[in-house]
Design a protein with these regions (language model features):
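Active-site-proximal helices and loops of the catalytic beta/alpha 8
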Residues: 30-33, 41-140, 205, 222-250, ...
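Substrate-binding/active-site clefts of carbohydrate-active enzymes
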Residues: 1-38, 59, 65, 82
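Aromatic/acidic polysaccharide-binding cleft in carbohydrate-active enzymes
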Residues: 138-185, 203-242
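The substrate-binding groove and active-site-proximal loops of carbohydrate-active enzymes
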Residues: 7-24, 40-50, 106-113, 183-195, ...
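A structural motif
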Residues: 37-40, 211
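Carbohydrate-binding surface patches
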Residues: 269-312
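Solvent-exposed beta-hairpin/edge-strand motifs
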Residues: 311-323
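C-terminal beta-strand-rich structural cap/linker in extracellular carbohydrate-active enzymes
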Residues: 325-341
Length: 341
């Protein structure tokens, strides 16, 4: 007789306090040793809220035994520093988290222009999270537990009414038609096109925001999936959206070229429902033998053109999306990144 995890019949709850089980996972010759023998650099712990701090620390010790500079990222949906969890607060086991807590308001900001929610969570993160955690958070396009990125920005079935029990998570789309419908549903071409433009703006923000720009496999080529489990389709080798792929490659190239973004300080300069401006400051002043001070990112989240005000004689545009260079305006749902020397 087995207990089910969250009442899912094929998910068996294991005894986390069992010494035999702990040894099976963390002991010499155990599962973690086997994984590192395959050449991995670290692990992501799923549903850390259901594990004890002691067990997570055992897993960290097993990782450290194999690779002293291992990386452990924890899946947690809340602010772990308010949950009195030692696995993250002592810095000895988990190094960082999946950034559900901030990715939710970022998606809400783009879809619903909810600047209040975004400002609240940005303030909380910068005030309560250590820099080492902020710099290594997984800022994801989507994950295995939510609809695909392109579906999240299609605004179909998107509900966030005040007082709704799902108010906290923007990826809880309406489920009125059931799993069979979800498994075969494809976005209409016009909706897909509009959603694609929005996800590019999402990519732009994640590129310059502190943390790891994390792409859930398939999001880079436009994989669709409404809800869980439709989001877990195999990679569409013969149906690749080259436009999305090209955009993400451009964004990732920026991350590689401007290495100071990994540890740059962040300041929010403006945040309204229509406009989001932040800067990343180069503390070391040098990167690849080039001197520059910072990058300013200007996002037009509104529906009208936005004059570009932050560019001066000492700056140059290094990335743009929906930007009219002739008239020096950012078009609706566009963005510009300015390198300041």
């Amino acid at each position: 007789i087995f207990d089910y995890w969250w009442n899912i019949p094929d998910e068996v709850v294991f005894d986390k306090d069992s010494k035999e089980f702990q040894e099976y996972i963390c002991g010499v010759g155990g599962i973690i040793d086997w994984l590192f023998s395959l050449g991995i650099d670290g692990i992501r712990i799923d549903v850390a809220d259901d594990l004890t701090d002691y067990f997570i620390n055992l897993m960290a010790d097993a990782c450290r035994r194999n690779k002293p500079d291992f990386l452990m990222i924890i899946e947690v949906w809340k602010n772990p520093f308010r949950m009195n969890r030692s696995y993250i607060s002592d810095g000895k086991s988990a190094h960082s988290i999946m950034n559900y807590y901030l990715m939710a308001p970022v998606m809400d900001y783009l879809n619903l222009q909810d600047e209040v929610y975004l400002q609240e969570k940005i303030n909380e993160e910068f005030e309560e999270y250590p820099n080492d955690t902020i710099f290594t958070e997984m800022n994801f396009t989507s994950t295995h537990d939510m609809s695909r990125q392109v579906n999240l920005f299609a605004n179909e079935g998107y509900f966030r009414e005040q007082g709704d029990e799902q108010r906290e998570w923007p990826w809880n789309l309406k489920d009125e038609y059931g799993r069979q419908w979800q498994s075969t549903y494809i976005l209409p071409k016009d909706v897909y096109k509009k959603a694609k433009e929005m996800l590019k703006l999402h990519d732009f923000i994640l590129t310059f925001w502190p943390g790891i720009f994390s792409i859930f496999y398939g999001d880079e080529v436009g994989v669709q999936g409404y809800g869980n489990l439709a989001n877990r389709k195999s990679f569409p080798w013969k149906r690749i959206d080259k436009d999305i792929l090209s955009h993400k490659r451009k964004m990732l190239k920026i991350r590689r070229e401007y290495k100071f973004l990994r540890t740059a300080a962040t300041n929010v300069l403006e945040l309204t429902k229509d406009k989001f401006v932040f800067e990343r400051i180069n503390a070391n002043e040098k990167d690849d033998q080039v001197d520059y001070k910072k990058i300013i990112v200007v996002v037009n989240n509104g529906y009208t053109e936005l004059p570009l005000e932050y560019k001066n004689k000492e700056g140059r545009i290094i990335a743009s999306y929906n930007y009219n260079s002739t008239r020096n305006v950012i078009c609706s749902k566009g963005a510009v990144a300015i390198l300041i020397y």
